[in-house]
Amino acid sequence: MSCRVIPSSTDFTRNLYTATLVCVISFATFQVSQSLYRHILRNSRNRHRIMSSSSASSSSKNDAESLRCNRILSSKLYLDVPTSKVPLIYSPTYDISFLGVEKLHPFDSSKWGRICGFLIAARVLDKKCIVEPLEASKNDLLVVHTEQYLNSLKNSTKVAEIIEVPPVALFPNCLLQQKVLYPFRNQVGGTILAAKLAKERGWAINVGGGFHHCSGGKGGGFCAYADISLCIHFAFVRLNISRVMIIDLDAHQGNGHEMDFARDSRVYILDMFNPEIYPFDYEARRYIDQKVEVVSGTTTNVYLKKLEEALEVAIGTFDPELIVYNAGTDILDGDSLGRLKISPDGITTRDEKVFSFARERNIPIVMLTSGGYMKSSARVIADSIVNLSKKRLIDTTKP
């Protein structure tokens, strides 16, 4: 005989609650697992996207470096210079003559030829011994410059802005290419070649160049091409050099090369400049390894003492395989743009100190003439080179 047990209402309620709780927990677990799955999937996709982006960025960077290297290796600017020539580089194409318009800028655009003329007259240099460079091609310029920047130079207004002569904007660009930019490109070729000659002979002087306000993507201050940056990149690839010191003693801050080599540990920048004048580039100042400020009115003795101290600090911090010396003469007393009070003899002593610094440590040195806005600059530069020759810091005689 069977007996059926009828559950009490309490048991029924408990069972219903338990079943409901199980359903809720199961549903919640399902929702959490679904959410977790979506989160993992989304993170996986993001990770893949980031890795793909990073990989693409790395690949793009490697491609750009490879292209830069190929451009440098295919360049014709590294001429084989016979030993009958001295490592002093100049071409008559350096000088700018443009219907008198060049006189609207305070820069002496014929100083380069006048420097060589003084050296020849002083019998320190034989005209036949001067090295003539090639013009930097577009492919050469693309080693540092962007295509966009080079294309911007096809606009006369842009060129006028860079060389700071507003009326030039009214001229056809083809004229500016021939009369202004062509001379600049020849000087760029000279600066690039100077590094090769310095490595071979111990020193080289480009009687031109030093366009230190121009970076890869921006020109200004009478500087249309970044010859210093180009020179250094060529040296990295063609000369197997890995450490370069820039000693920039122009009165103005060298903001162009500072931006190009921002955070590049291969390049040490010593920049001694007047902070009260153009270009007021505070971002670029962050990338100067040793900043030496010389305010308006600084005199010769004070200047030379600061230079001596700066050179000692530099060599104690960095061991260069090449020095690029930007030897602007706009520090001369009377130069309205530099606003310093350095005597002509002070310039001679300054250059001697820098060349002695390089010679004592057996470091190849490239000298660029850079800025200088007085007619007397050409004579001062020539006299300084004569002094370097007399002190046997350079040899301008034929072998």
Task: Outline where the language-model segments fall.
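Short internal beta-strands
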Residues: 89-91, 131, 271-273
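Short catalytic helix/loop segments, enriched in acidic residues and glycine
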Residues: 105-121, 350
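Short glycine-rich His-centered loop
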Residues: 85-105
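A general "terminal functional-core" signal
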Residues: 2-43, 47-54, 59-68, 75-84, ...
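Short, glycine/charge-rich beta-strand/loop segments that flank catalytic centers
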Residues: 131-140, 207-211
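Charged, often glycine-rich, active-site loop that binds/positions anionic groups
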Residues: 134-159
